[in-house]
Structure formats: structure tokens, C-alpha cells
Amino acid sequence: MRIGELLALQVKDIDFEQGTLTVDESLTRLDGEDLITAPKTESSVRVITIHKELQDEIKEYIATLYHVRPGTRLFAGRTKSFFEHEMERGIKLSGVKKITVHCIRHSHASMLVQMGFSPVEIAKRLGHGKVTTTIETYCHQSMDAQEKIADRLGKVERGEESGL
């Protein structure tokens, strides 16, 4: 998710029965005021399936909120700067290299590529309007993938795999 989409999430956007999260708004800050708008593009409006462990974490988090209603924003009062500051704090404590909030989105997409999901599936999950955006940004060739291709072709050549 984009940071603005995350900041705009409301309790009603989480469907625990279906295991989904609906992205249909984005939050931006203009002249010190929070402004809820439509997401970046029309294709950014989407429903994301989330795994059980994440659902449980979200339930636990919601239980910590005060006076929860369907329209309660999950991260009310938080800003992009807040998340950036918390990331910076975590980076210093852990000693890892500097990463940004957007790096998490990029890492998620790259992991999905490595797991073998198609660019079309990944584009839908990320809310990209064009699959080419996903391909150009996240589907760059890795040496690891190239080695796997060569290994598999070798197995086909040796008759260890059918290739089908």
C-alpha cells in the first residue's frame, strides 16, 4: 500500500469474514490539514486479500483504539512524517541500512516476483493502472532467477524434467 492509502484506512475497510482490506481513499496533508481524497489512480481502488496472521494483528491493534466505530481511522493523528520518524528510530536501533516507508512497498512487490506471482496479479495488489509499471519497476531480472532458469533448462536437457 502507498502511505496515503494506509493513513486513510478505516475500521470499516477491514472485512475479517472475507479476509480482505478495501483501499478506496488516500490521505494527504495540505497546509497542515488532513485531506481525504480518492487514491492515486482509478485502479488504485482495490480489495486486497490479507492472511490470517495479519488479520489477527489488525484485530489486536483495533482493540487498543479508543471508542472504535466503523469510520474510525486506524492511524488517526499519524502522518507520513510520523512513520518516517519511527522507521528512522527502528533503523538506528537495529543497525540495518536506511530504508524508507516506500521501500517496504517495493520489498513486498519484489518478494511477490521472487515467489513467482505474475505481474498481472502483483499489479492488481499494488493498484497499478498498467502492468508495464509493475514490470518495469519490480520485475527486473536477477542473477538468482537467471541461474534457476539455466538449472531448469539443464534438467530438461538431461531428461530429469519434462519442461512442461
Q: Where are these predicted regions, by residue range?
A:
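Extracytoplasmic/periplasmic beta-strand context in beta-sandwich domains
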Residues: 19-21, 46, 72-73, 136
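Short, contiguous acidic/charged loop-to-helix segments that flank catalytic cores in large enzymes
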Residues: 35-45, 74-79, 95-103, 140-141
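Active-site/catalytic core of tyrosine-dependent DNA strand-transfer enzymes
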Residues: 18, 26-27, 51-97
